[in-house]
C-alpha cells in the first residue's frame, strides 16, 4: 500500500455544536436518573443569548430543563457576558411533545411479539430504521484510529489548560485537527497539527502559538510521530476572539464524525446525543463498536468495521456485515457467524447487556463516544475477546 495522509478533527466542549450535544444529553441523563424507561429525543439549538430545547419526551417524572441548561453551560465555561454567551443571562425556551404513538407502538411491541414469539428480548422493536456502524483498529491503545485519537486528546488538553488556569486567556470554543501519514496501513508520523483556540483579545498570536505548542501539543503527540517536517497551524486566521454560540449557531447532532471515528469508518447518518437507548441510532452504534472492538482485541483482525441494519418496530436486525479490509485471520463470512453466535443485537438485548438505561451520556457528549480510556464505558469492554479468539481459531 502506498503512503497516504489521513486527517481527523475534534472540537472542545465549548464548540457550539458540542454545547448543544451536552445540553441534550444532560437533559436525557436527568430524566433517566428518575425514569429509566423514559423515551427521549431531545434536540437543542444554541445561538447568541438563546437556548431552544425541542423534541419528543415521554416520561413519568419532572426535570427542571432551564436549570439543567444553565448548569451545563456553566460547567462548560460560558460564565461571562463578554464571552458572547452567559449561563446566567441566556434565554431558555422549550417546545416539547410526547413521542408519536405510531412510533411508540412499534417499540412497545415488536413485530416478533405481535407474531407470537414469546421472548423477553423480542418484545422491544427498534425505534427507527437505519444503518449503524462500529469500528476498531489496533493502531492505538484504545483501538481507535490514530488521527481521531490524537485530535480528541488535543481537544481535551486544550480545555484542560483553560480550566485549570495554565492558560487563563483561553476561552471555551476551540477545534483541533491532526493529519497522520500512513505507510503500508500503519501510522508513521504526524504531518500537520491544526489548533484554533478562542482567546482574550489582548493576547498576541506569537504567545498563543508558543503556549499551545508547549502546553498542548508537546504533552500529547508522541515524540516518535513528530518530525522536522511536522507543521503546526495555530489559529491560522490570526485571531479567534468571537466564538461559541455568538459566532456560530450550535445544533445537536452536527458533529457525528467527531463523535465516532473521525471519518476512518463509514457512518449510517444517525446522531447520538439526546436519544434514549431504544433509539438504535445510539444503542446499536454502541453495540457495533463493542463487536468490532472485541474482534480486534481477539486478534481476529487488525481492522474491523461492523454494519448492522434495522427496521422500525422489528427487534431482529435485518442485516449484518463485517469488513476486515483484508486484515482478518479468518474470512468475513465466518466472522459474521461468530458475531451472531456471541452477540445478541436486538435492541432490548443490547440495552440489557450494556446496561444502557442509566444516566451515562453527558460524559460522552464531548471528546468522542468511543475509545474513552478515561471512562468506564460498557461498550468499550473487551470481555468477549477470549471466547471469540477460541471460537475463531479453534483454540
UniProtKB/Swiss-Prot annotation:
Q: Mind naming one GO cellular-component term on file for this protein? A: cytoplasm
Q: Which organism is it from?
A: Desulforudis audaxviator (strain MP104C)
Region annotated Flexible loop sits at 99-109
Q: What does the cofactor field's note say?
A: Binds 2 divalent ions per subunit. Binds 1 potassium ion per subunit.
Chain positions recorded as K(+) binding sites: 43
Its gene is: metK
- The protein here is known as S-adenosylmethionine synthase
Q: Name one GO molecular function term.
A: methionine adenosyltransferase activity
What is annotated about its quaternary structure and interactions? Answer: Homotetramer; dimer of dimers.
Which pairs of Cys residues are joined through disulfide bonds in the record?
none
Sequence positions that bind L-methionine: 56, 99, 248, 279
